[in-house]
A protein has these predicted regions:
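Two-component/phosphorelay signaling modules centered on CheY-like receiver
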Residues: 21-22, 29-49
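C-terminal output helix
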Residues: 106, 120, 124-133
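Conserved sequence signature across two-component system core domains
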Residues: 26-27, 51, 69
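Active-site beta3 strand of CheY-like receiver
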Residues: 64-71, 75
């Protein structure tokens, strides 16, 4: 277990960007984090970083700018994964997928208030992980297209002589 913990601590450092979908893992269980890293790499994703606590995750997000975040709900530190997700600046528009061993309604309701792009209840299959990431990225692209179209519409409306912008 010491080797896994040491390996996880070393991997908490920022990993330089590469081609592919950049996934950040927020998970405090070394075995789970290493399994996720292995599966994500096998699926062609790039693990941009691994954080074990909410405070560490928020700092790392600003450094690595991941395409998607896999966030365990129950992590070490002063804030859990739900609070951490709620503190990610909205302007970054980073999809968060919650990983949890908990499936009770109160936890899922609290998590849904942060508008996650998905949930995976542990244990989950690798194909479920891949499909959830794919759907989250597709939704993120659609959300970005909506934001761009809204901005274009706003500019068009503001250029009309009768508009008050």
């Amino acid at each position: 277990m010491e080797i896994l913990t040491e390996s996880l601590t070393q991997s908490a450092a920022v990993i330089p960007p590469k081609a592919g979908t950049r996934v950040m893992i927020v998970e405090d269980e070394a075995v789970v984090a290493m399994h996720l890293r292995q599966e994500l790499t096998k699926l062609g994703h790039v693990v941009a970083g691994i954080a074990t606590a909410g405070e560490q995750a928020l700092k790392m997000i600003e450094e690595v700018f991941p395409d998607v975040i896999l966030m365990d709900i129950h992590i070490q530190g002063e804030m859990d994964g739900i609070e951490t997700a709620g503190r990610i600046p909205r302007y970054l528009h980073i999809p968060v997928i919650f990983l949890t061993a908990y499936s009770e309604d109160t936890t899922l309701k609290r998590a849904s208030d942060t508008r996650p792009y998905g949930y995976l209840i542990k244990p989950f299959l690798d194909r479920e992980l891949h499909a959830t990431i794919k759907m989250a990225l597709e939704r993120a692209r659609a959300d970005e297209a909506v934001r761009e179209n809204e901005a274009l519409l706003f500019r068009a409306l503001c250029t009309t002589p009768i508009a008050e912008c």
